């Protein structure tokens, strides 16, 4: 019979339209889905079953939700309407796509559309009892999560408050310590600056004195070098002069000695010619007497000088007395040659009793 059926007639279609329930929702046209969409829907369904959700939507944290959880729970509704039982008068097509022949081609009336929307709103307003139980479970879960989150938030706030208080206390203590340290550092810096100023002033004074002393030292060194050079030259000159003086005195002594030797030889020759023998002892005594007289004269002169220094007004009388005393022994001392006969002075210029002036000069030179 299915093969002989050719479709609905116009009368049958009219009758179906008249007998159709206005509150019955329009059957959705099935849409072919790809393999990826099917896998995705399957994964979403598994995840919703794990989390206890029926509609397959992933659960979110309360702080991630944009609206209140109750409104979200109330807004959820079953998207797939209950399938309408096919009437015996509406057979399916042989192709299996679910389309009724002739229905898609005919336009739908606006009254039917309004009745369809009213039926949907009635379904939303009157949910099934299973949905209510699930909503209550969701609300309880969300409330428990919300309370846990609130407790955690309170704990975190208390911890943050304590941490802030500790940080403020630590900052205050550190600031006090830093202020005390800065005060100490400033005081130490001032003391060091004062010491540096004192040291710098002392160093400046000492440097000026050192510069002055170095200049004076350089002048003294130059003068010392000049004096040393002059001293060395003077010493060398003195040494040369002393050497020349010694040489000249030696030469003079040798000349005088040679002259005296010649005189002695000459006198011996003359005495031999005159057959006169010289008394050597008398000559020696005469020389000693002359030396004593000279020594007495020198002592008298020294005494006169000392007396003049002590008492200058009476110096003339004392000097006259000393001169008289010195003259008296000269008068009283007789010459040994006058006592002997044949030794008196004669007209002969070469007599032995008359001393030679050259011999006197020689004796004076030897005495000096």
From Swiss-Prot:
Chief location = cytoplasm
Q: In which tissues is it expressed?
A: Expressed in small intestine, kidney, skeletal muscle, lung, spleen, brain and heart. High expression is observed in osteoblasts and skin; also expressed in osteoclasts albeit at lower levels.
**Which stretches are tagged as biased composition: Pro residues?**
80-89
Query: A Pfam family for this UniProt protein?
Result: Transcrip_act
Cellular component GO terms, alphabetical: cytoplasm; cytosol; Golgi apparatus; nucleolus; nucleoplasm
Provide the assembly information.
Answer: Interacts with RCHY1. Interacts with SCYL1 and RAB6A/RAB6.
Similarity comment: Belongs to the GORAB family.
- What name does the UniProt record give this protein? RAB6-interacting golgin
Species whose genome carries this gene = Mus musculus
Gene encoding the protein: Gorab
